[in-house]
């Protein structure tokens, strides 16, 4: 059986000509016959001339507007400037003596560090004509329905928001995220309208303007609520009411520095409660404003400048009228740049942060309440009701959980800090008294030792004289006894005229010797325990032995005087 011979597979065409040949199209267009060939050839030749490179270039050159002249002139100027720069640089660095590489680099680093440390944003310095009133009485509200009413004293809402954010010391990434949301136009509108609504509510009530502002506040809050991404809504709106309350409070402090006494703790409590209830429908915890880091606003602006104290400013303004023109003191410069002015001790002490201390009592009374965690924002409900949006139910099923709430605060009582301070003060007073009494006891012991030494020396001298002349010994001894009696009498008179505390602390009489151990024992039990008590007992024994030695010496002297008198009588007889 014969096998079929394999057929050769035809290769695909590799070029356009091979493709035409494989399709039997290689004869086209050779077989095309055109009438009036001369006319077609002439037309084809003209067409080739019209679409040539030279013709197209010449046409574009004449008809298309060119900007190359401007570019050429700019390039020529840049080349000229580059040449001048190189020439100037060559003149600067032609000598190596003019530069020091090490010193240049060190100075550069030092200058960069200096600029980084003292860099501050540019601030708008208001002239005297632009200065406005800095108290509540001199401020008025002008409602603008189609635009926001500007804050007093040309304040910028963005700067106030940034100041509040920086006080929280947020991380850089978190700061950038919240910054984009809190500096949005609807958040700025909330700050403006909330500030003016609270200004009218607290100081200059106007029902019509307040209602208009409240409508706009609701619209701004709904717009902000819809713009925040869903994944950030919960976290953002947990912190935003507190941030807005701080921003409004900061605006009041910056707008009316002369009325800062009105912005007390009650003002902050009412402001925060109102904003929290508007935005979330829940009241914050009592004393929520204690964590605000805005204590320095009374003495420092949001830009870091020191405020001129009100009393000092009034004094300067009153003295300005009596200042002569020859004195080179510029009051305006001092008022515009008060950084060099000293801060009053009262204001600096008020800026110190005080830690809260609890009362020494049983604490507040508590009770259980139902906490509704399905509450809604009154602003959003008001917005829905105002626009009468259909198909949206504003009612909800109450869901809640019991939690503990304070029923009654404890009555005022000494706090633990006050008790600790009082105990420390008493301990310091006792320590001072102990040191004073201890020093007095040491002085008394030293005095007794010196007196004992004097008595011993006097007795030795009398014993030495006894062997020489009995009459002289008798006279000297009588003089010595008379001297001791006079000193004892003077001391008794002095003790009678002295205060009871001094008579108790004296060690010259038996009563003082009995009272001083009790006093020393009290101080020893407070400060040093048994060791000081042992020392006081040793001191008592020493004092007792000293007095006994004095008594023995007195008895010996009496015996010697009797012996001397008897010997003198016998010799005389």
From Swiss-Prot:
Pfam family of the protein (one): FWWh
InterPro entries linked to this entry: FAM227
Biased amino acid composition, Low complexity: 497-521
Top-level division of the source organism's lineage: Eukaryota
Coiled coil: 429-485
Cysteines paired by S-S bonds: none
Region annotated Disordered, chain positions: 497-528
Keywords: Coiled coil
PANTHER family: PROTEIN FAM227B
Family that this chain belongs to: Belongs to the FAM227 family.
Name listed for the protein in its UniProt record: Protein FAM227B
């Amino acid at each position: 059986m014969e096998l079929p011979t394999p057929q050769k597979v035809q290769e695909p065409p590799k070029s356009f000509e091979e493709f035409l040949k494989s399709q039997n199209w290689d004869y086209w267009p050779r077989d095309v016959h055109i009438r009036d060939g001369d006319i077609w050839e002439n037309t084809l030749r003209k067409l080739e001339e019209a679409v040539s490179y030279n013709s197209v270039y010449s046409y574009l050159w004449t008809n298309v507007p060119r900007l190359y002249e401007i570019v050429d002139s700019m390039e020529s100027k840049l080349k000229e400037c580059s040449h001048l720069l190189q020439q100037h640089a060559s003149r600067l660095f032609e000598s190596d003596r003019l530069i020091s590489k090490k010193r240049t680099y060190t100075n550069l680093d030092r200058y960069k560090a200096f600029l980084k440390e003292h860099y501050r944003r540019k601030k708008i310095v208001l002239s005297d004509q632009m200065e406005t009133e800095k108290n509540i009485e001199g401020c008025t509200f002008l409602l603008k329905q189609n635009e926001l009413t500007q804050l007093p004293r040309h304040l910028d809402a963005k700067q106030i928001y940034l100041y509040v954010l920086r006080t929280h010391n947020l991380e850089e990434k978190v700061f950038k995220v919240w910054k984009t949301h809190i500096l949005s136009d609807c958040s700025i509108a909330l700050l403006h309208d909330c500030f003016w609504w609270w200004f009218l509510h607290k100081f200059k009530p106007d029902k019509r303007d307040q209602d208009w502002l409240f409508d706009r506040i609701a619209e701004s809050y709904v717009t902000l609520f819809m713009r925040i991404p869903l994944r950030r809504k919960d976290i953002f709106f947990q912190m935003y009411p507190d941030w807005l309350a701080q921003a409004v409070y900061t605006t009041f402090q910056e707008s009316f520095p002369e009325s800062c006494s009105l912005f007390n703790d009650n003002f902050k409590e009412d402001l925060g409660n109102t904003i929290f209830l508007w935005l979330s429908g829940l009241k914050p915890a009592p004393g929520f404003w204690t964590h605000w880091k805005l204590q320095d606003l009374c003495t420092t602006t949001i830009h870091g400048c020191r405020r001129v104290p009100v009393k000092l400013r009034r004094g300067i303004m009153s003295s300005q009228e009596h200042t002569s023109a020859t004195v080179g003191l510029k009051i305006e410069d001092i008022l515009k740049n008060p950084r060099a002015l000293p801060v009053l001790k009262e204001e600096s002490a008020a800026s110190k942060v005080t830690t809260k201390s609890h009362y020494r009592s049983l604490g507040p009374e508590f009770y259980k309440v139902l906490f509704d965690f399905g509450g809604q924002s009154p602003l959003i409900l008001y917005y829905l009701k105002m626009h009468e949006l259909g198909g949206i139910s504003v009612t909800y099923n109450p869901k809640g959980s019991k939690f503990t709430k304070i029923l009654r605060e404890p009555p005022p009582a000494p706090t633990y800090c006050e008790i600790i301070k009082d105990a420390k003060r008493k301990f310091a007073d006792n320590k001072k008294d102990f040191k004073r009494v201890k020093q007095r006891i040491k002085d008394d012991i030293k005095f007794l030792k010196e007196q004992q030494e004097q008595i011993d020396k006097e007795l030795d001298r009398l014993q030495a004289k006894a062997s020489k002349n009995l009459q002289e010994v008798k006279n000297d001894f009588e003089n010595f006894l008379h001297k001791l009696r006079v000193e004892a009498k003077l001391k008794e008179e002095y003790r009678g005229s002295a205060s009871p505390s001094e008579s108790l602390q004296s060690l010259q009489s038996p009563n003082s010797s009995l009272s001083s151990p009790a006093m020393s024992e009290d101080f020893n039990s407070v400060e040093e325990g048994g060791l000081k008590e042992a020392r006081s007992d040793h001191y008592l024994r020493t004092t007792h032995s000293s007095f006994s030695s004095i008594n023995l010496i007195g008895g010996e002297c009496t015996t010697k005087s009797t012996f001397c008198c008897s010997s003198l009588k016998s010799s005389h007889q």
